[in-house]
Design a protein with these regions (language model features):
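Cleft-lining beta-strand/loop regions that shape enzyme active-site pockets
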Residues: 1-132
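Conserved functional hotspot residues or short segments at active or partner-binding sites
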Residues: 149-150, 154-296
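Polar, glycine-rich mid-to-C-terminal structural blocks
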Residues: 96, 108, 115, 119-187
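Generic detector of intrinsically disordered, low-complexity, polar/charged segments
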Residues: 23, 36-37, 73-75, 111, ...
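A residue-level signal for beta-strand positions that form part of recognition/binding surfaces
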Residues: 1, 56, 134-136, 186, ...
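A broadly conserved detector of short glycine/acidic/proline-rich loop/turn motifs that flank catalytic sites
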Residues: 6, 91, 116, 139-143, ...
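General "foldedness" signal
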Residues: 13-18, 44-48, 66, 73, ...
Length: 296
């Protein structure tokens, strides 16, 4: 089992070290946990994928309206080309995580378990302007080996729908039931082995696992059903609107919120609204409450 929290500059070297230690201990198959991994350095993900691929297999390609297709293939030097692999994903897994899981799935090299990934797959270039500022221009998209576009749908000018996609997926029950996942029959693709996979943004898992509901307690149900959770999210946004509006990407916002004392602040707020503090139940539901607040 290897948990990859972020694709940083040194992630690949750490990954190789972990693989070597596991093999030395007798490990012959691997579970790669990408849950909560928002991406990072693309080269790190590609190098990791290469460890599991036979020579000549397509890993990923990029293509844009004015940007010619560019393919990346496995070079055959990987140390785990025949090792069984399982990849764990969730709705936060994004970007490089999706390239990794998409390549494994489309090449039939392993099984993807969890929930549909975020759907972030844009190629951007940075342009320096005369006033010293810089602009990031989207020039292409990332595609999995079968031809699936990783980037989720975006309608020009409709930023609200794009920004609220995760929340809408939650409200539609997609995190709790496989039946709530909408499969677009017009976006069917085939893996190397002939299995059908679906496009439409993000990577659909081979095996669906609903979100963990072990954190649902009477305290959690109370703050949700009373509307206090949503009310706090609105008031928090109003109090920190300037700061929250300063982030350029959702990853920056997510990382910022991860460092804030949201739970303790919320519990104090809920108490002013008549929700009694229940330390034991709060401890059980804490992570779930934090996730909900961040989603709002």
């Amino acid at each position: 089992y290897i948990k990859v929290s972020k694709f940083a500059r040194n992630t690949y070297n750490e990954f190789i070290t972990a693989i070597a230690k596991l093999k030395q201990a007798g490990c012959t198959s691997f579970v790669i946990d990408l849950r909560g991994n928002t991406g990072g350095y693309m080269d790190a993900a590609i190098n990791m994928i290469n460890e599991f691929m036979p020579e000549g297999r397509l890993i990923v390609y990029t293509e844009g309206k004015s940007f010619p297709r560019s393919d990346v293939y496995a070079n055959g030097t990987g140390t785990c080309k025949d090792a069984p692999i399982v990849v764990l994903t969730d709705e936060i897994s994004a970007s490089a995580s999706e390239i990794f899981s998409g390549a494994i799935q489309d090449n039939d090299r392993g099984t993807i378990i969890g929930r549909r990934t975020y759907g972030k797959g844009l190629v951007q270039t940075q342009m320096s302007l005369s006033d010293g500022s810089e602009m990031r221009l989207t020039i292409a998209r990332y595609y999995t080996p079968s031809g699936r576009c990783i980037q989720k749908k975006y309608e020009m000018g409709n930023t609200d729908a794009y920004d609220q996609d995760i929340y809408n997926r939650y409200m539609h029950g997609e995190f709790d039931s496989a039946d709530s996942i909408k499969m677009d029959d017009s976006l069917k693709y085939q893996t190397v082995g002939g299995r059908t996979v679906y496009g439409g943004g993000g990577i659909m898992p081979d095996i669906f696992i609903p979100r963990d509901t072990s954190g649902v307690t009477s305290y959690y149900s109370n703050v949700v059903n009373s509307g206090v959770l949503y009310l706090y999210a609105l008031e928090y946004s109003d109090r920190h609107r300037e700061k929250l509006g300063s982030f350029k990407t959702w990853e920056e916002l997510y990382n910022y919120l991860q460092q804030q004392p949201l739970l303790s602040d919320f519990v104090n707020f809920a108490a002013t609204k008549g929700i009694k503090r229940r330390p034991t139940l709060i401890n059980i539901s804490g992570k779930l409450i934090e996730n909900q607040l961040q989603a709002y």
